[in-house]
UniProtKB/Swiss-Prot annotation:
One of its GO terms (molecular function) is protein-folding chaperone binding. It comes from Vibrio vulnificus (strain YJ016). This is Co-chaperone protein DjlA. Keywords: Cell inner membrane, Cell membrane, Chaperone, Membrane, Transmembrane, Transmembrane helix. The chain crosses the membrane at residues 7-30. It is found in: Cell inner membrane. It is a single-pass type III membrane protein. Residues 221-287 form the J domain.
Length: 287
């Protein structure tokens, strides 16, 4: 944590202006520390005390997402065909073409480098998102999706995901919960559970895939997608649903700095939550 500017500002402020001078000096010192931190992270600012622009934040989030995705894919030593297909499919879902697609591909390749600076990049992501929980959560969920590309999460990938989660400010328990939710979501997706549509799976059928599940299994996965127990009552179900929809609302994420290219993926996530909720609601018989 950089506090040199705060200490120096408070000291000289108190020296020349007493308590009020110290407070003013503390504020000036804080702005100095902030500018220094941004500069060290590689961001250009418009002026003293100002952070990166919205466009800079979105570009950083976009490139970092694909770079870290490449790092996750490389975790077990070799990037599989399924992982490359998943990255390509994500680019398709974002409607990336031309320069944008090349930027995403370059970032993905960068993430596969042996000396990839993961911790530094995660620090840049935190700065780019201003530490907003829902944006950081969306970033983490993208990486979890990448880890599930070939149907299962390898121990090496899990270790990298724990590093990513810690770097973004999430606990191991929070990561494990999201891993369970994502695994359930993939099973639900294969059954055409999102709005009744059968989405193309990125998992290879040669790996066995997920077997066609019974209605009971689909319902169990719906509960896991919402992060609740099967014995949850109507109030608990609604509370979990509203919380997740609030955190993943595409328009809210866009307003907070989500790159516009990722809007479709945010919509898919909210549709996933909605479909799981609708199934539970139908089963429990409440409106």
């Amino acid at each position: 944590m950089q506090i040199f500017g705060k200490i120096l500002g408070a000291f000289f402020g108190f020296l020349f202006g007493g308590v009020f001078g110290a407070l003013f000096g503390l504020f000036i010192g804080h702005q100095f520390d902030k500018a220094r931190r941004l500069s060290q992270a590689g961001f250009k600012t418009a002026g003293f005390g100002q952070g990166p622009s919205q466009a800079q934040r979105q570009e950083e989030f976009f490139k970092s997402a694909f770079a870290v995705m490449g790092h996750v894919a490389k975790a077990k030593g070799q990037v599989t065909k399924e992982e490359i297909q998943l990255a390509s499919a994500m680019m398709d879902r974002m409607s990336l073409h031309g320069e944008q697609r090349r930027a995403a591909q370059d970032a993905f390749r960068e993430g596969k480098e042996r000396d990839f600076p993961l911790e530094q990049l995660l620090e840049r992501v935190k700065i780019a998102t201003s530490g907003r929980f829902d944006l950081l959560q969306f970033f983490l969920e993208l990486q979890i999706s990448a880890a599930f590309a070939d149907g299962d999460v390898h121990p090496s990938e899990r270790n990298v995901l724990h590093k990513i989660a810690r770097g973004l400010g999430f606990s191991s328990e929070q990561l494990e919960r999201r891993l369970q939710m994502q695994e359930a979501a993939f099973r639900f997706q294969r059954q055409g559970g999102f709005g009744g549509q059968q989405h193309q799976s990125h998992h290879s059928s040669s790996h066995g895939g997920w077997q066609q599940a019974s209605q009971t299994d689909r319902l169990a996965d719906a509960y896991k997608i919402l992060g609740i127990d099967a014995n949850a009552d109507g109030k608990e179900v609604k509370r979990a649903y509203r919380k997740l929809m609030n955190e993943h609302h595409p328009d809210k994420l866009m307003a907070k700095g989500l790159p516009p290219e990722m809007m479709n993926m945010a919509k898919e996530k909210s549709q996933e939550i909605q479909s799981a909720y609708d199934l539970i609601k139908k089963e429990k018989g409440f409106k």
